[in-house]
């Protein structure tokens, strides 16, 4: 954990010795590249990629989209239900990469419960470390390129950073203590 690797090393050089049943979560501040890294890692290793952010953005539920547009987190029970549904469809034996969950202490417990009921456990938590300044630059660039509405409002961006600092970043200690945390220089 003390050694910080680049995400290119993790994706391109690191071979996962036993892919069967590998469950990986990707965490990091807004704009750190969670979606990009998740997709590359899943593609390289034949894993299923589950992005809770994409699930919400593609949802027909306008209330969920309004919550995101304000920079708030979706309620834990809704996120857990969405993840449980997607994991139920995934090929767990081939491995899964999850980005966007967990984001709260309660969600870590929910994730443990969901995985336990499916007969698998979490193998790694990859933390994409990136400064707030660089994250903000990436978010604004993404807003311009992809037209993501939730990336265009500076107040919403600040709220997302605050939510991350207060609710999500503290989760890293749990995964560090369980020796599942891999820190990546994003």
Q: Model-predicted segments: where are they?
A:
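Glycine-rich phosphate-binding loop of ATP-dependent small-molecule kinases
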Residues: 1-186
């Amino acid at each position: 954990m003390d050694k910080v690797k680049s995400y290119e090393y993790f994706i391109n050089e690191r071979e996962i010795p036993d892919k069967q049943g590998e469950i990986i979560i990707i965490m990091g501040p807004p704009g750190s590249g969670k979606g990009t890294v998740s997709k590359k890692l899943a593609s390289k290793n034949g894993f299923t990629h589950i992005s809770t952010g994409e699930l919400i953005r593609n949802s027909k539920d306008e209330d969920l989209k309004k919550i995101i547009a304000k920079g708030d987190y979706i309620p834990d029970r809704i996120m857990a239900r969405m993840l449980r549904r997607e994991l139920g469809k995934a090929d767990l034996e081939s491995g899964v990469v999850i980005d966007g969950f967990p984001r709260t202490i309660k969600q870590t417990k929910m994730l443990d419960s969901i995985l336990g009921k499916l007969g698998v456990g979490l193998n790694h938590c990859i933390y994409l470390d990136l400064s707030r300044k660089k994250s903000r630059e990436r978010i604004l660039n993404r807003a311009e390129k992809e037209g993501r509405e939730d990336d265009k409002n500076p107040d919403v961006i600040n709220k997302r950073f605050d939510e991350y600092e207060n609710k999500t970043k503290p989760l890293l200690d749990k995964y560090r203590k369980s020796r599942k945390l891999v820190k990546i220089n994003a």
